[in-house]
Amino acid sequence: MAKLHDKYQETVVAELAKKFGYTSVMQVPRIEKITLNMGVGEAVADKKIMDHAVRDMTAIAGQKPVVTVARKSVAGFKIREGYPIGCKVTLRGERMWEFLERLVDIAIPRIRDFRGLSAKAFDGRGNYAMGVREQIIFPEIDYDKIDKIRGMDIVITTTAKNDEEGRALLDAFNFPFKK
């Protein structure tokens, strides 16, 4: 079992219940899922680009992503309905906790010129969204085997009712927010 999951069950639940005055442990916010999304607009011209993106995402997430396709044709972007334009993966359970651990302990400290995560990226309902500019911050990616530096979106969905609860939950997991 992941260390962060043990920490959540042993200390975080009690801390948050005390801080927000919850009467039941089921009221305490928890992380529901983590969604990774990689938009690969260049895949319209070359199908191999999508294969590389899927390979990278599989290595990072530990499970195979779903290829997302264009819903509408847009002449300005030279895409047609049904063209593959990205990939996404939703992590839950054990894989989610393991990914969160790697994100906080290994990947985030490897971001170039890192000055802390923005605390403004909460959506009003306690969910946190962040962008990563380079997939090479993850140790699973072999720098010599990548064809192009790609970024991705990481969304952490929680059961928190508001941003304050969501921030307290992520703070308990040592997320490095800007002061």
UniProtKB/Swiss-Prot annotation:
It comes from the Bacteria. Pfam families: Ribosomal_L5 (PF00281), Ribosomal_L5_C (PF00673). One of its GO terms (biological process) is translation. GO terms for molecular function: rRNA binding; structural constituent of ribosome; tRNA binding. Keywords: Ribonucleoprotein, Ribosomal protein, RNA-binding, rRNA-binding, tRNA-binding. GO terms for cellular component: ribonucleoprotein complex; ribosome. This is one of the proteins that bind and probably mediate the attachment of the 5S RNA into the large ribosomal subunit, where it forms part of the central protuberance. In the 70S ribosome it contacts protein S13 of the 30S subunit (bridge B1b), connecting the 2 subunits; this bridge is implicated in subunit movement. Contacts the P site tRNA; the 5S rRNA and some of its associated proteins might help stabilize positioning of ribosome-bound tRNAs. Part of the 50S ribosomal subunit; part of the 5S rRNA/L5/L18/L25 subcomplex. Contacts the 5S rRNA and the P site tRNA. Forms a bridge to the 30S subunit in the 70S ribosome. Belongs to the universal ribosomal protein uL5 family. This is Large ribosomal subunit protein uL5. It comes from Shewanella baltica (strain OS155 / ATCC BAA-1091). The gene is rplE.
